[in-house]
Amino acid sequence: MCMCMTRREFLQAASIVAGGLALTGALPRAAAGAQPLVSVPKVLDGTQAILAPLITRHARLLDDPWVLMHGVRAMGPDFTVNSERAVDLLCSRFLKTQRVAGKDYLYMPVEHEGHPNACLKTLLEVGVPLSHPFTLDGRRYTVGDLANSAKALFVFDPKTADRDNLAWTLIAFSLQTVPSRDTWTNAWGQQIRFTDVVRFGLDTLDETTRQFRQAKAQGVMPTEKDTIMGLTCGGTHLAYALASCVANGHGGDQARARLRDYLDLHIWRLQADGYLMDRFYRQAAPPKDADPALQRLAAIYYHDARLKFYGHSFEIISYARGHGLLTPTPAQTGTIEQGARTLHESVKAIEGTDFFEFRKTNPRLFHHLVGDSCHAYHGIRMTPGVNQA
């Protein structure tokens, strides 16, 4: 998902108005007393209180594995639908098999998970053990089978790799690969060295942020979007994924230093991206005498864009702080606190919104609202033993 919509997307969405249905569900009990990995600015206490019911209401969909995955990402492996764990629904209903060289491998179709290995990384991140069993088409498997299949099916060539599909695989492999034994042979006989994949990810961060780095060095706000903003959710997934790699020992001291350099830039982006978003939505705003429905839709897109970037950013910041990868300076702490206020404002603005209003007529916006709410909740309340391994 992109951080902002284009003018064409806005105009196409502007004519969409629809009714919806309601689902209910309680917050998983395990989330009530557990302590987050790190503390976040106090204003976000109220933010998570708004997000939790939005997630439990809108993410319990039996026919939408992408939404289910995000519910698990926010609430952890105990997230249920009709008393059945979403983790088991995802594995038993939506996984498929692919045959390569006479052997079957498990995978989640990309039309279900959005990006390769998004389902696997979600299961591993929330602490589902590799031994966890499930049944698919009458056959017994484990999450470990899915993890081994992902490695077997992974193909890597830095000359042709889609750098916008890398983040989810980086997370999954960082959690199941021992740094000292990070080389394997895939199903087609290609040797994969995970260190090379991590380096490619770090190179991507560097190459897509050149303009931002220049503006930061000059002490000015950017005049245009940088390339990283064209990556999914403004490149935040890639940054988080590389933090997972470094935290789990991949890439050594050089990777840690390169990541730390980017984290400094990302805190600067809390101001820079906000500046660019505000400018974009001011220019795209409908006239004051426009149809109220159009004005409301424009406002929802604006608030979701901020929810997306700042929610994903707090995932990065919370994870990096919790794993000793980031110790903000006093000035950076002030920037983070301002980002927290912006995130709270965006969430407060969508409080009470019925996301189902958009599910049939504007499914992209529906997915934005649900997914971004889930990532923001996880960033605010990243809790070991609940929604974080």
What are these regions (language model features)?
Residues M1-M3:
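N-terminal secretory signal peptides that target proteins for export/translocation
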Residues E9-A30:
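N-terminal export signals
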Residues A30-A389:
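Preference for long, amphipathic alpha-helical scaffolds in soluble/luminal domains
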